[in-house]
């Protein structure tokens, strides 16, 4: 049985394993993921499904794009997992294997495969919902389909998996918004750096 750690315990463990300063742009993302993993560690019904593993690895990858130094990312991910009793190696392996299963497939093929997991007794979480969404979004024909039809397909799959579409829709919306805000913040930082260089040359 996993040890139930408080958020303070998890933060202490995290900083012991990751003794580096986290750039301000990424600090909120890291804090939110740490708290979320800690809370999931407390849920007795929680099951670490392969779709959850995809959600964790892929959202981490997307939300930490542009992180410097890049070589810290591996330790950062491992520290986040270890600090709440999750096993980073197993999570990465499960994610890689699962992504291979759904690779180069159409939306229809992915939909059939995902719906086969309807008896898996999935534990609803933001990370799981995003794992499902990111697999669907990787479909070869996803970009060719209009938004209303995309939403209907996502809704059908989520409902078939006995999960809440309203919650999934909210999680997906917040995730997309976070990605957009990160991109905008990075652009502003880049512009500020260019401006600063020009000022110094004067």
Curated annotation (Swiss-Prot):
The answer to whether UniProt assigns keyword Nucleotide-binding to this entry is no
- Which Pfam families is this protein grouped with? ThylakoidFormat
Q: Does the UniProt entry include the keyword Acetylation?
A: no
Q: Which residues form a coiled coil?
A: 174-202
Keywords linked to the UniProt accession: Coiled coil
GO biological process terms held by the UniProt record: photosystem II assembly
Q: GO CC annotations?
A: plasma membrane-derived thylakoid photosystem II
- Output the superkingdom of the source species: Bacteria
Outline what the protein does.
May be involved in photosynthetic membrane biogenesis.
- Family assignment? Belongs to the THF1 family.
Q: Which protein are we looking at?
A: Protein Thf1
The scientific name of the source species is Prochlorococcus marinus subsp. pastoris (strain CCMP1986 / NIES-2087 / MED4)
Give the gene name.
Answer: thf1
């Amino acid at each position: 049985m996993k040890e139930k750690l408080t958020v303070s315990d998890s933060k202490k463990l995290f900083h012991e394993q990751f003794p580096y300063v986290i750039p301000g742009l990424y600090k909120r993302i890291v804090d939110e993921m740490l708290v979320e993993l800690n809370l999931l560690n407390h849920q007795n019904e929680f099951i670490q499904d392969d779709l959850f593993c995809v959600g964790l690895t892929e959202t981490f990858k997307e939300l930490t794009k542009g992180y410097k130094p890049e070589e810290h990312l591996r330790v950062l991910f491992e520290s986040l997992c270890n600090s709440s009793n999750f096993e980073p190696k197993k999570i990465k392996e499960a994610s890689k294997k699962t992504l291979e299963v759904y690779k180069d497939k159409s939306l229809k093929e992915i939909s059939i495969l995902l719906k086969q997991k309807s008896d898996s007794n999935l534990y609803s979480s933001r990370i799981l919902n995003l794992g499902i969404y990111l697999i669907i979004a990787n479909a070869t024909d996803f970009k060719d389909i209009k938004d209303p039809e995309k939403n209907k397909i996502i809704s059908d799959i989520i409902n078939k998996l006995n999960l809440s579409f309203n919650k999934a829709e909210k999680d997906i919306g917040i995730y997309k918004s976070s990605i957009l805000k990160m991109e905008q913040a990075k652009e502003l930082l880049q512009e500020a750096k260019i401006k600063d260089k020009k000022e110094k040359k004067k």
